[in-house]
Swiss-Prot record:
Protein known as: CBL-interacting serine/threonine-protein kinase 3
Domain NAF: 307-331
Protein source organism: Arabidopsis thaliana (Mouse-ear cress)
Keyword Nucleus set for record: no
Domain of life: Eukaryota
Any Pfam family: Pkinase
Length: 441
């Protein structure tokens, strides 16, 4: 097998891999603890940007609080590190994808299933609120599923990355995706984080049960008006109890909007409700956080880049495949999440050309480097420009696996893009039948 050279990156004891998410202030990469082998998510912040926007103290405060929160439905924050130029937040790595993907793939949920996810969501939100931590940006991308199908809320407590506290002492935000955002947030006159989170939970519940958004319009001003009025229609298949609860939550007046405590007493919510039982540990060691924000030289971690050959072996292929089922790697019709894989025939350079030929007519700019490609849609969608990252791995001399992942933008747009891309590459897709023929030889 021809092995190409690839630069491997290391931060402290963590081996850093592919990018799995990207935002204005942060990039998230897959990483692995070299001492334990445990996979983690590594959120990388640029120190200069943090200081420029005067967010250091607020981020320090929220990270310190999040380190104390150990809730089964909240992505856990393990530790914080820093180099001379970057801040690294080590988070639990969640493997089940976004809750939104489940709706896209399977459609709306039955009430019992939706209720279970909503119960987990409300308990976690209320728990964090009770400790003074608010999300303020609850949306499908932040609602993940673990390998057991349990809800995990990500980015809880890291809202300082997109929120600003002004002189009036209230929170202010400029929101790029308003569908899940409370009316008072859109008005930008300041708002309470707890009631704003509650509204977002109501929109999430509606989407789980209906399969579509309660407030939607291609015209942004019309969308703002719909949200501000709080007028929406419930689909006829919803039970009366579900309709009543959604109506109480999607109250445009934050002063009369239902609270988590009132939701806990709601009859529809209480059905089959079992609050999670978990141990609240007192992890009060904040030395790593203090060191990061005091620029302590002795606690700075080193970033290393080392040249070494990258080969994808059988174990890696199996570990990348859901349910240890290799058929998913060779099936272009597979269900997928924020990232997916497709196996193609031909040489690596030939495959790069074919992906470029397929992406450009779809309106994407293409950047290439070291068998990796970055595709950016020049036309902004609902959530800004869709950015897609691809990386090519060699399985055999004329057989390559291409990993396709969303690094920025709307998940639904990514799903549509992937289907168009895989259709364009149909002639070179290595199908499941070919795998079986090869195996039978």
């Amino acid at each position: 097998m021809n092995r190409r050279q690839q630069v491997k990156r290391r931060v402290g004891k963590y081996e850093v891999g592919r990018t799995i998410g990207e935002g204005t202030f942060a990039k998230v990469k897959f990483a692995r603890n070299s001492e334990t082998g445990e996979p983690v998510a590594l959120k990388i912040l640029d120190k200069e940007k943090v200081l420029k926007h005067k967010m250091a103290e607020q981020i320090r405060r929220e990270i310190a609080t999040m380190k104390l929160i150990k809730h089964p439905n909240v992505v856990q924050l393990y530790e914080v590190m820093a180099s001379k130029t970057k801040i690294f937040i080590i988070l639990e790595y969640v493997t089940g994808g976004e809750l939104f993907d489940k709706i896209v793939n399977d459609g709306r949920m039955k009430e019992d299933e939706a209720r279970r996810y909503f119960q987990q969501l409300i308990h976690a939100v209320d728990y964090c609120h009770s400790r003074g931590v608010y999300h303020r940006d609850l949306k499908p991308e932040n609602l993940l599923l673990d390998s057991y199908g349990n809800l995990k809320i990500s980015d809880f407590g890291l809202s300082a990355l997109s929120q600003q506290v002004r002189d009036d002492g209230l929170l202010h935000t400029s929101c790029g995706t308003p569908n899940y955002v409370a009316p008072e947030v859109l008005n930008d006159r300041g708002y309470d984080g707890a009631t704003a989170d509650m509204w977002s939970c109501g929109v999430v519940l509606y989407v789980l049960l209906a399969g579509y958004l309660p407030f939607d319009d291609s015209n942004l001003m019309n969308l703002y008006k719909k949200i501000s009025s709080g007028e929406f229609n419930c689909p006829p298949w919803l039970s009366l109890g579900a309709m009543k609860l959604i109506t109480r939550i999607l109250d445009p007046n934050p002063m009369t909007r239902v609270t988590p405590q009132e939701v806990f007493e709601d009859e529809w919510f209480k059905k089959d409700y079992k609050p999670p039982v978990f141990e609240e540990r007192d992890d009060s060691n904040m030395d790593d956080i203090d060191a990061v924000f005091k620029d302590s030289e002795e606690h700075l971690v080193t970033e290393k880049r080392e040249e070494q050959p990258a080969a994808i072996n059988a174990f890696e292929i199996i570990s990348m495949s859901r349910g240890l089922n290799l058929e998913n790697l060779f099936d272009p019709e597979q269900e997928f999440k924020r990232e997916t894989r497709i196996t193609l025939r031909g040489g690596a350079n030939e495959i790069i050309e074919k992906i470029e030929e397929a992406a450009k007519p779809l309106g994407f700019d293409v950047q290439k480097k070291n068998y990796k490609m970055r595709l950016e849609n020049v036309k902004a969608g609902r959530k800004g420009n869709l950015n897609v990252a691809t990386e090519i791995f060699q399985v055999a001399p004329s057989l390559h696996m291409v990993q396709v992942s969303k690094s920025k933008g709307d998940t639904l747009e990514f799903h549509k893009f992937y289907k168009k891309l895989s259709n364009s590459l149909e002639q070179v897709v290595w199908t499941n039948n070919e795998v079986k023929k090869e195996t039978a030889k």
